Amino acid sequence: MKRTIAIVAGGDSSEHDVSMRSAEGILSFMDKEKYDCYVVEIKQGNWNAYDTDGTTYPVSRADFSFDTPDGRREFDFAYITIHGTPGENGILQGYFDLIHLPYSTSGVLVEAMTFDKYVLNNYLRGFGINVADSILLRRGEAYDEEAIAKRIGMPCFVKPAADGSSFGVSKVKEADQLAPALRVAFMEAEEAMVEGFMDGVEISQGIYKTADKSVVFPATEVVTSNEFFDYDAKYNGQVQEITPARLAPETAKKVAETTSRIYDILHANGIIRIDYIISKDQDGNDKINMLEINTTPGMTATSFIPQQVRAAGLDIKDVLSDIVENQF
């Protein structure tokens, strides 16, 4: 008997449309011989399931079921692909825990922590993971631009502490640019982070583990003519993505080991993607710096994870089946 899968997408953040595109990708990748799939869109308090023929069914938030002409349907599994709240910060995971529905991502604590970049950086620093120096600021809080510039250095990045897809992120080159950059960041979140600039090569690497396997995908190198890998670069093609990344073999091995270690430190679940900056230390050796973790990475046909799956010689259909079946 086929399992019924909810591909949960949308959400209440600026990333709603990006999430819906990922849902379309996952729907196309899923093994239809094993699973009956519905996209469930969450938007402004409305939860709706979409059949493959476009029919819409309101979803009950009491038990995550919906009525069809053939009777009530219940889901066996939720594949969460919301980028931002409530799917990437632990809220939706808590709901699914309450109704005892298995899902694709890490649990509440891991999702909440990885969504808050400042908290995540400080947590991983305690395990010896290299991260940028940063300062946390809250909306309405007084701050000294010159003191921040002296502490963090210039250039630096200003970003929402809890957000994704580079919404609200600015590269700041002078202290007097901090105030307008913070205003942009505070449009997306209550807290903003001023983070030191790390000069180097940006790469991104996906990973997943199940009860019987550990799969680290080939890393992708990100080359952009933009100031940084911003929203425009990510989603409007202003970037060159090279998979596998052009890394020295020893560096590639160390990055993969770091990716696996971070996954274990977090007790992560499902597919996650970790972004890094590969800089040079004072001796000219490659230094691996963790930049960000994506626990619901993009899943369109051109997103990093599908690219990396292909580069690894794997079938994305089988990878997604691994994620589902690991919960049963």
Predicted segment positions?
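ATP-binding N-terminal substructure of ATP-dependent carboxylate-amine bond-forming enzymes
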Residues: 1-104, 108-109, 113-115, 119, ...
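Active-site nucleotide/adenylate-binding loops and adjacent lid/helix of ATP-dependent enzymes
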Residues: 2-9, 13, 21, 72, ...
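ATP-dependent carboxylate activation and anion-phosphoryl transfer catalytic cores
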Residues: 3, 128, 249-328
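Residue-level detector of anion-binding/catalytic polar loops
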Residues: 36, 102, 130, 191, ...
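Short Gly/Pro-enriched turn/cap motifs at secondary-structure boundaries
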Residues: 85, 160-161, 196, 263-268
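A glycine- and small-aliphatic-rich helix-loop capping segment at beta-alpha/alpha-beta transitions
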Residues: 94-103, 174, 179, 311-312
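Phosphate-binding site of ATP-dependent enzymes
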Residues: 173-257, 280-289
